[in-house]
């Protein structure tokens, strides 16, 4: 169960998506969603690394100021 949705609800949603977009468009949509998730994860990871770099630089600056 995902977010309060059971298997019957997920099947109904999948059928509606198939009707709206058609079977031919589904691989393109899936690929686009996958790329979006990958880019989001990369941006999050980069932001965390940059945050860590800022903390390290601030600590070094504090040591130099003493």
Swiss-Prot record:
Checking InterPro entries in the record gives: TatA/B/E, TatA/E
Picking any one GO molecular function of the record gives:
protein transmembrane transporter activity
UniProt keyword annotation of Transmembrane present: yes
Q: Where in the cell is it found?
A: Cell inner membrane
Disordered: annotated span: 45-66
Query: Cellular component terms, GO, for this chain's entry?
Result: TAT protein transport complex
Q: According to its UniProt record, where is this protein mainly located?
A: membrane
Which residue ranges run through the membrane? Answer: 1-21
Q: How does it sit in the membrane?
A: Single-pass membrane protein
Keyword entries, A-Z: Cell inner membrane, Cell membrane, Membrane, Protein transport, Translocation, Transmembrane, Transmembrane helix, Transport
The GO biological-process annotations, alphabetized, read as: protein transport by the Tat complex
**Keyword Acetylation in record:** no
The record's function comment reads: Part of the twin-arginine translocation (Tat) system that transports large folded proteins containing a characteristic twin-arginine motif in their signal peptide across membranes. TatA could form the protein-conducting channel of the Tat system.
Please give the subunit comment from the record.
The Tat system comprises two distinct complexes: a TatABC complex, containing multiple copies of TatA, TatB and TatC subunits, and a separate TatA complex, containing only TatA subunits. Substrates initially bind to the TatABC complex, which probably triggers association of the separate TatA complex to form the active translocon.
Q: Belongs to which family?
A: Belongs to the TatA/E family.
Q: What is this protein called?
A: Sec-independent protein translocase protein TatA
The organism is Desulforapulum autotrophicum (strain ATCC 43914 / DSM 3382 / VKM B-1955 / HRM2) (Desulfobacterium autotrophicum)
- What is the gene called? tatA
């Amino acid at each position: 169960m995902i977010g309060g949705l059971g298997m019957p609800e997920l099947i109904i949603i999948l059928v509606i998506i198939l009707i709206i977009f058609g079977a031919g468009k589904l691989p393109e949509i899936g690929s686009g969603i996958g790329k979006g998730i990958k880019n989001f994860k990369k941006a999050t990871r980069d932001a965390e690394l940059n945050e860590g770099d800022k903390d390290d630089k601030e600590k070094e600056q504090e040591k130099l100021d003493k």
